[in-house]
Regions:
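Bacterial N-terminal signal peptides that target proteins for export
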Residues: 2-13
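Hydrophobic core
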Residues: 14, 18-22
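His/Asp/Glu-rich acidic catalytic environments and adjacent acidic regulatory segments
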Residues: 28-75, 99, 105-293, 301, ...
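C-terminal, non-catalytic "cap/extension" segments appended to globular domains
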Residues: 35-37, 45-46, 50-52, 142, ...
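Active-site-proximal, well-structured secondary-structure segments within enzyme catalytic domains
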Residues: 157-163, 211-226, 255, 259-402, ...
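Active-site recognition of the HExxH zinc-binding catalytic motif
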Residues: 276, 404-424, 446, 451, ...
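Conserved helix-loop functional segments at active or binding sites
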Residues: 353-364, 390, 419, 423-431, ...
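Post-HExxH zinc-binding segment in Zn-dependent metallohydrolases
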Residues: 437-466, 474-480, 554
Length: 626
């Protein structure tokens, strides 16, 4: 993930927790101690601070030197010179605060059992809260300035670095309330997270699941964490028992979860109305200045190409020899018993070969990342077990991995390197104020690498089994990233629109909406079980206010980028990687040759999905498996 600026850090924490939700925790038993891993496979955080004392010096500098200075600017930002001084001081402070915060968190992730480092992390979080409070007056004061004044600053050469920032402020002006109104909305934020908090407490703390018999007849405890693994089991009866065990538990609390989700939707509608937006969807999209047409066209394009998903479900039915496909049949691998054991050194070579189309300069940065200890490679005792990319403006990027010799690990590494090199190029090109990469474009950089890698591996596949494995990997990736996420997006849109019309959302209503979507998306070969219509009750993303559509747009955009790169047009893409937030996300993508306001990118990706399914079917027929 990309390093975020101040106002993005909380969002980053929430989103990051969902992205790595299936693998987060402490390291498993029997893994090596950190001291047993050669230095070349460990990231070098000393590139940020060579000692805890130097980290502490910067922490104190932020707290005791920078923060007190902002009192001198409060109430004085109508003075052009004072405003410029204040913005520059904020950037100066934030560059140091970012380093302090990022270092402490990454250091803690090396060993989550180290109490001394956990203290550092806690101190950095307290510091960031104080930083946030110290600069919180800036935007409200700017928003109270006359539009004419803000526009004049945008034309002033001394504000050249802040032109984009001021333009974004100006766009928010029609949606800004009086000081009293803003104060009320700020007070409301204290309980705005309550629906999500109740959902997580209920789902992860209070909800209990039954014991079931596994595929060998042993009694096991069913948990949320183990459920995904059980759905991949070859034993259909076991999969069904796991499915029914999970969803029968959610069925007991469906009315509570319906009330919780309704509260979340009503909250979004309330804030949208308060800020004079036409809808909750419009208010959410406005945070990254995304036109409504992008969301609507995404749903339209997926609906127009839903036949390809129906074809894939039909293929599943044939391969698994079923009368009807149920939801617990959608995750068992179609390609069994094919494993690719790829050690880390091999992975590096594969990535350097697979990403060759990106050009010599990109490969040069890749080699720097591999050779200069940007990457923490292997699982160790008490190490954070997710995977991410992070860093600050004044550091090189860092990547945390738990590499395990699988194809999934290779693709994860390529993905995180995409984020890292995006960050590297942006920070080398943009001023701090424009160095944040919005999520809408950040995931394009990482997904582009994944698609390039799979294309490369498909070209060098030595057998039908290897090719089938890779095809299935890509098909499942597109299904999960596009079809499933757009199904979620369509559900979110409908439930918000119903509340905006004054309709109530009961558990029955929500299940009916979900059931109808399942019928539409999965087609005639699919059987919608009554318990499966409770799927909405488990999804944390529905408490993230129209977030999931970005997964789908990112993959569609990345597919267009890859086609251009494979034609030899890398220059536009490298410029895209340098853009940061120097322009709005839609414009940045247009400069890279991708227009996400049209349906074309999604149409192209899903047509490709259909072709991949056709090729899978052809190989399976050749092998006599269908």
């Amino acid at each position: 993930m990309k390093r975020m600026h101040l106002k993005k850090l909380l969002v980053f924490a929430i989103i990051f927790s969902f992205i790595v939700t299936t693998v987060i925790g402490f390291a498993s038993e029997g893994v090596k101690k950190r001291s047993e891993i050669p230095d070349k496979y460990k990231w070098n955080l000393e590139d940020i601070y060579s000692s805890p004392e130097k980290w502490n010096a910067d922490l104190n500098k932020v707290l005791n030197y920078y923060i007190p200075k902002f009192k001198n600017y409060k109430g004085k930002l109508s003075d052009k010179n004072k405003l410029l001084e204040c913005l520059k001081l904020r950037d100066e402070m934030m560059r140091i605060a970012d380093k302090v915060y990022v270092y402490a968190h990454m250091k803690a992730d090396e060993n989550q059992a180290d109490n001394k480092v956990s203290e550092m992390r806690s101190k950095s979080e307290t510091m960031y809260a104080q930083v946030s409070a110290a600069v919180s007056f800036i935007q409200p004061e700017l928003l109270r300035l006359p539009e004419k004044t803000l526009k004049s600053y945008m034309q002033d050469k001394s504000f050249a670095d802040y032109k984009m920032y001021l333009d974004a402020v100006l766009k928010q002006k029609p949606h800004t309330l009086s000081p009293e109104g803003e104060e009320l909305l700020a007070l409301a934020q204290d309980f705005a997270g309550s629906p999500y908090n109740i959902f997580t407490q209920l789902k992860y703390a209070d909800l209990t699941f039954p014991k079931i018999k596994d595929d060998k007849g042993n009694e096991i405890q069913l948990t949320e964490a183990s459920y995904g693994k059980y759905l991949e089991n070859k034993d259909r009866d076991f999969r069904k028992r796991a499915f029914e065990g999970i969803y029968s538990s959610f069925d007991k609390v469906k009315n509570t979860l319906a009330a919780t989700l309704t509260a979340e939707v009503k909250k979004n509608v309330f804030f949208a109305k308060a800020r004079k937006y036409n809808s909750a969807l419009e208010a959410s999209l406005a945070q990254e200045f995304i036109p409504r047409s992008v969301y609507d066209n995404l749903i339209k394009a997926v609906n127009n190409n839903i036949k390809y998903l129906h074809k894939y479900v039909e293929l599943r039915k044939k391969v698994l020899n079923l009368d009807k496909v149920h939801i617990y049949d959608m995750y068992v691998p179609l390609v069994a018993n094919y494993e690719m054991n790829i050690d880390y050194e091999q992975a590096k070579k594969l990535i350097l070969e697979g990403l060759k189309p990106l050009g010599n300069d990109y490969l040069k940065v890749l080699n720097i990342a591999f050779n200069n200890r940007w990457i923490d490679v292997f699982e160790t005792e008490n190490k954070y077990t997710g995977g991410y990319q992070w860093g600050a403006y004044d550091t090189h990027p860092y990547i945390l991995m738990n590499y395990n010799n699988t194809m999934d690990s290779v693709l994860t590494l390529a993905h995180e390197l995409g984020h890292a090199i995006n960050s590297y190029y942006t920070n080398k090109t943009q001023k701090y104020i424009n160095s944040n990469v919005p999520i809408f474009t950040a995931e394009v950089a990482s997904t582009t690498n994944e698609l390039l890698m799979i294309n490369y591996l498909l070209k060098k596949a030595k057998s039908d089994d290897e090719r089938l494995y890779l095809l299935n990997t890509l098909v499942e990736n597109i299904r999960g990233t596009v079809y499933t996420q757009v199904m979620y997006a369509e559900f979110e849109k409908e439930i918000h629109e119903r509340v905006e019309k004054g309709e109530a959302l009961s558990a029955e209503t929500l299940s009916n909406i979900w059931g109808n979507l399942m019928k539409k998306y999965y087609g005639d070969s699919f059987e919608v079980d009554k318990l499966a219509t409770l799927w909405w009750a488990r999804i944390p993303h529905f408490y993230m206010n129209f977030y999931v559509y970005k997964y789908a747009t990112s993959m569609a955009a990345a597919n267009e980028v890859v086609k251009n790169i494979e034609k030899g047009d890398t220059a536009k893409y490298i410029e895209f990687l340098k853009a940061g937030s120097s322009d709005y996300p839609i414009n940045v993508l247009k400069k890279a040759g991708v227009d996400m306001t049209s349906t074309k990118p999604v149409d192209n990706l899903l047509t490709y999905f259909g072709q991949l399914v056709d090729e899978m079917e052809k190989i399976l027929k050749k092998q006599g498996k269908i």
